[in-house]
Amino acid sequence: MQNTELLLKELTLEEKCALLSGAETFKTRGMPEHGIPQIWLSDGPHGLRKQAGESDHLGLNPSVPATCFPTASAVANSWDAALGEEIGAALGEEAAAQEVSVVLGPGLNMKRNPLCGRSFEYFSEDPYLAGKLAAGYIRGIQSKGVAACPKHFAVNSQETRRMASDSIVDERTLREIYLTGFEIAVKEGHPRSIMSSYNLVNGTYANENKHLLMEILRGEWGFDGAVITDWGGSNDHALGVKNGSTLEMPAPGGDSVRELLAAVESGKISESDIDARLSELLPLVFDTKAALDAAPREFDAAAHHALARRAAEESLVLLKNEGSLLPLAVGSKVAVIGDFAKNPRYQGAGSSMVNSTQVDVLLDKLIDSELNVIGYQQGFDRHGKPDAALQKSACELATQADTVILCMGLDEIAESEGLDRSNLRLAQNQVDLLQAEAAVNPKIVVVLYSGSVVETPWLDNCQALLYAALGGQAGAGAVADALTGKVNPCGKLAETWPLAYADVPSAADFATRRKTVEYREGLYIGYRYFTTAEKAVRFPFGYGMSYTTFAYSDMVADEQGVSLTVTNTGSVAGTEIVQLYIAKKNSELFRPAKELKGFARVTLAPGEKQRITIMLDDKAFRFWNVKANRWEIEGGEYELLVGASVEDIRLCEKISVHGTATVHPYEDRDLDCYYKGDVLHVSDADFEKLLGHPIPKGKTKIDRNLTLGELNHARSPLGWLVWLVLTILLDVSYKRGKPDLNILFQYNMPLRALAKMTNGAISMCMVDGIVMELQGFWILGLVRVIYEAIKNVVLNAQMEKRLRGA
């Protein structure tokens, strides 16, 4: 094992600077002459995506086969941190087998709005639940000697303009909603690394945000690992290093090294800043490489497939079961309809896309079951194109069956990294088919595949609804077993399903192309809004049915937690997820009506009862006092609410809590909309009161951070031409029903990313020349680009020669 302190004395300043950026798309820089190995990083929130050949960060090129587990959005419905730890261990084992040192996951973004195209990669709208699950994944991954890298830190809630948007959020909301999940993950999971997000937070890029990285992450939480940029997410590398960012990825080449050297020479940063970052990076490199060298190069694919199936089983959510239609009786004549039954949708698109070791198919599993499958019909085009012939054939088959199993869902491009959803609806051709089927056979079981929320105005047209989410490569077997009763679906929703998208508090201004993203709703995301505003929803947070029933009784409560008895009052075994919420009536503060503070899973045989305890931790009663700039507790009477969902509260006890708050957090207490939770249309004045300062107004500037999608603002025909070509290509791909992820990435990419993602082929000085052209200085800009290009080639060659010791 290398001694980092001695090694830092041995390295030249240039060598140190070179180590703080990647060498290739997914590889760090190694220096064999100093005993520093090169290590692999790989995407892997729900399955490893190591690209042995040509690499990219969008999941466009093939990767080495790996187990595709259910997505985070699915596993969250299990409310099972221990399951997350098992999945994490399997991910770590596969990473070690493929010589990957860092798994880029899990994803911890809060589900502020269900239209986020990447929601399938994230756990929940609740930071406590998300943090607990993420900590489990992290512990599992790192148990195999591999580093986990939770992401994206922080306040990153949309894909639109994700590399250049500025999240404007008040400090209390930042702390209580968007950072608490990360805090739990860091303190309980102890990750070796963490990934910063692309966006700005209150005017400063997350990757160079001193408040986030140095004051909170490293200072308050004690994180001593490596902060890794998202791919191409570095803005000012020197400022990032100074303020706590460790490794710039993917491969900016020699330009990044020269940037740091110049910053040291100018006094912008010191060599001790660079040493501090290397003291975070090098132990990770040495430790993971040593663990990988000792790890087997194979893993038990069959065992991991079995784990993926069990994870899918625990993640199924039964949303409707009218007349106890499910489970289906042995020998039932069933018609299987829907393209998803034969061509499974089991994962999302983008950098998390896994090349699965195998994929189970629901139709095959149903044919192999004890049901009498009388036939299959595609029923609809999965990409939304109307087809009367497909619908007619499906309806004819439905008339011959006792029960119809109709597989519906979102297609592959509806949910993806790089773009946000345009609505929460299923394709109309699927809804039309369901209505036509219901007219000829009312006994319909809908199996729904999606990575996030969908609107369900069609719910009355089916008798049962089983939410399969995105269940991974083994999800089909889990669904088949649930339909036949071999598995009792006991999952519960980790996010609220609204009646309509317009009910979502951030609906009016989500994913606009404005430079600023204003978090006007504050604390009120998900159930925190719906319960406070007393707004009806389709399915509440924490909701899920079962083939059995449970009774809660004999609750005892104090400041430490609650204990109660849970009894299985039904006729089959099942698992109940008991949820603990707190509420404070007549609070001096505005606060959500209920907040999740604990949960427990309990599996019981028919008639069995068990005493369970749910402990409260140090985060249970705290709030962030923006006036005192610290965590405090409001004293007084609290209600401890235990229930089967946020709306289905079974037991309640009141306790008295000693407070610490001595000063009210808000000088201006006239924040009526926040006290009422009426945040659908927060005024500028109220939002400024919440922020404590005027609302920043983002202005489009022709500089390094101008995105390619904003080149229509350029004072250059070349800029307009590039913008026009990209826009046309993007529009064409949308009209084909298959948005091009590569073009989307380029469209939302700032000019500076050209210098961060081209392996040194383009320098930042060349980007500055391009900016001059776009500002209207065509000749000067072109001359500078050419001059800097020649200079860049020469300087890169000289640097590589020095680093090789030639």
Short names for language-model regions:
Residues 1-619, 623, 637-641, 646, ...:
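Glycoside hydrolase catalytic-domain context in secreted enzymes
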Residues 47, 368, 507, 572, ...:
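A generic signature of intrinsically disordered, low-complexity regions enriched in glycine/proline
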Residues 618-665:
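Terminal connector regions
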Residues 646, 653-723:
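Charged, amphipathic alpha-helical linkers/stalks
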